[in-house]
């Protein structure tokens, strides 16, 4: 079945390409999704009229993706996880976890757009690549940390010390009175 692509389709072609696909794929997916139309003479003429509008829409989407890329470059995503002995994670950090953390920060990123070769299984900082558009990729900084973060004991001791001296001073004042 010959079709004219009305949008960029991964592993198939880009806007305006005439491609040959299996009939079921064309009839059941590409045409109903509005990604393609049959390659007939009438459709070719109609497509030439629509092509400018579709190209403007594609350019608009690319511009939005570039803006999102710039915003994501400034963001640091922190995911806190439980760890065992030797700072070994219970489980792993996956694209779903990263997408959820981004959603909490008001970034609507599909988990399938987050490019992880393997799940993250150790603490640290990572640069995660995100496919925002077929032509635009962005990066976000991910920090995987322990639940509760690092605990600093020195400030806690300083806070307790004045309280003990105040109690001692109150006790001295009570005995003098």
Curated annotation (Swiss-Prot):
Coiled coil: none annotated. One of its GO terms (biological process) is translation. Keywords: Ribonucleoprotein, Ribosomal protein, RNA-binding, rRNA-binding. The gene is rplI. It comes from the Bacteria. This is Large ribosomal subunit protein bL9. PROSITE patterns: RIBOSOMAL_L9. It comes from Maridesulfovibrio salexigens (strain ATCC 14822 / DSM 2638 / NCIMB 8403 / VKM B-1763) (Desulfovibrio salexigens). GO terms for molecular function: rRNA binding; structural constituent of ribosome. Binds to the 23S rRNA. Gene3D superfamilies: Ribosomal protein L9, C-terminal domain, Ribosomal protein L9, N-terminal domain. GO terms for cellular component: ribonucleoprotein complex; ribosome.
